[in-house]
Structure formats: C-alpha cells, structure tokens
Design a protein with these regions (language model features):
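Flavin (FAD/FMN)-binding glycine-rich loop and adjacent Rossmann-like elements that form
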Residues: 1-137
Length: 137
C-alpha cells in the first residue's frame, strides 16, 4: 500500500497485485537419510557413482542456517565451478524404509552439498529419476 499510495512512486499509482505465494518457502529444512549422503566433496570434485541417476550443475551457494537471525554470519558464500556432478540413487531413497523415495529438496545430502542440489532443475531431474526408479522397484 505504501508504494502505491504514498505519492513518492507515481509510476506505481495504477499497479495491481497479480500474485502472492501462498506458502513462504524455506531455503533449507529437513533432509532424509539414505544409504549414501552426498557431500561437498562429491559436488566439488565429482568421481562418479555406479548408481548415478541424475546430474546437478548449480554452484555451491551457502547461506547461514539461521538466516536473518544470524547477523554476525556472512550473508552467503558462492563457490562456482564449470562441471556437472552425479547424483546416486542411494541419495534418493530411505536407508531404513524399503519403499520410501525422496525427490526434491529433501534428498540425503550435507548442508554444503544441499546448497547446490536444492535448485529447481536438479530437483526436477532427480524427480524424474525417482519416478522411473519407483516404477521399476
């Protein structure tokens, strides 16, 4: 309301709100534990896995786990690289529930590895892999 009605931003006088997300998204929350936990070493120095089902390529983009509640922490750290890294099926299923698969941001990964795997494109290819694996399971 302030931007539209204050008079300080005349170009916004006729703007209308088109869409608002109904649920705010957290950058990081729960991650499940699979038979393998992807680490930052797997992302930064990929070696390959015999059960690779997807690839990621986003840089490592870490943010403080406490977010704005940690003003003493640097806001973010980015480690760029020019390679893809493999994601094993073992990161996408439960280590103790036989028929439970994960897809999206909850895969078995460390905080630092998650800073690269949490992006939409990587989640999408992982979701495709999990769907295929579930159909074959």
């Amino acid at each position: 309301d302030y931007i539209k009605n204050s008079g300080e931003f005349p170009e916004a006088a006729n703007w209308g709100l088109e869409w608002v997300g109904s649920i705010p998204g957290k950058r990081e929350s729960r991650r499940f534990h699979g038979p393998y936990r992807l680490t930052e070493h797997d992302v930064l120095r990929p070696q390959g896995f015999p059960d690779t089902v997807a690839y990621g390529g986003w840089y490592v983009d870490t943010h403080p786990p406490m977010g704005v509640d940690a003003p003493e922490e640097p806001p973010c750290v980015q480690h760029h690289f020019a390679h893809l890294f493999p994601l094993p099926l073992r990161c996408y299923h439960s280590r103790n529930i036989a028929n439970l698969f994960f897809a999206g941001r909850n895969i078995s990964a460390t905080h630092i590895a998650f800073a690269s795997t949490r992006v939409m494109a990587t989640c999408a290819v992982g979701g495709q892999a999990v769907g295929t694996a579930a159909a074959l399971w």
